[in-house]
Amino acid sequence: MYRKILLTLALTVGFAATALAQEVTIGLTMGTTGPGASLGIHYRNAFQLMPKTIGGYPVKFIMLEDKTDATEAAKNGRELITQDKVDAFMGSVAVPSTTQLAQIANELKTPLMALSPVALPPDKLDWTFVVPQSTTLMMSAVVDDMKKKGVKTVGYIGFSDSWGDLVLKAVEEKAEPAGIKIVTNERYARADTSVTGQVLKVIAADPDAVVVGGSGTGGALPHIGLVERGYRKQIYHNHGTVNREFIKVGGKSVEGAIAPTGPLIVPEELPVDNPVKKVALDFTTRYEQTFGPGSRNAFAGYSYDGFLLLDAAVPIAAKTAKPGTPEFRQALRDALENVKNVIGTHGVYNMTPKDHNGLDERARVLVRVDDGEWKLLK
């Protein structure tokens, strides 16, 4: 059994002057193994860079491994809430896992910072706050680029799970009004090692462009297959593929791939007046100092932005309740629902009771693989 790793960032020695202060406990369930490992490792790494306090209170992180498995993630979520009595929890690396966590957040009335872009009805997100950009927001940038380039038909190949469904739905929603017809809907499992059959069907349809609805290294598989079989038109991805591992696996085959992502991938290329530039540049600099040049990625930024949202909400909640109590969890949820102008690495968050994501078009850019690096598409 995978047992918890305690990340007690607020050590007693460091807080002698605040010994009487209540400690805030944040639970984490991450898939650093399994098919989502190339994402989960980055989600986890971000916690080495977190401040030692949250909203002025000592903070303790309790991390559990879920192996990119929805059932395991659900079990971890329950354990963190019922046994560890966390004040809030964060996770996980895949939409199926995070969907399970959202249900548990509602049931056990504990705020969840969703690290995958789940798309559920508002009543299902009552206790969930979605950190990543919505799939619709991101894929609309892709459709805009296709329209600009005169694309009339597009092939789709994506995961055979809720993430693949989300990406397809977002493309469908924007493509039809733009006069773009989706001519294939091919699927593959996250753990598949070959997509030859699906790729051949896409090539047979001869679309003007292809959208891949995968994530992480799994998103490279159909791209490689398409290029190997002679497809030379534009291949688009989604914000689940923008990391170094995707390029390592894809090599020269993924040169020219276009994907939407958050500004933190290219902070140096952002205008000086971009509100996200300073925070994104600071985080990517510290991340690469710790984990090596070129290690920047969107997923560590989601963890950090989740922390920043909690950091803004904790002092508000603490005015009416003490950490470690049901009353504090309720107050924290209510505070999160109303945070304004929280500048993260991905965008500026403005939550409302009807919008538990709070991001706008400032939270997206298009990037392209150019000489083995993700660079801003200009």
Region locations from a protein language model:
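N-terminal signal peptide c-region/cleavage motif recognized by signal peptidases
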Residues: 14-18
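Extracytosolic ligand-binding ectodomains
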Residues: 2-11, 21-378
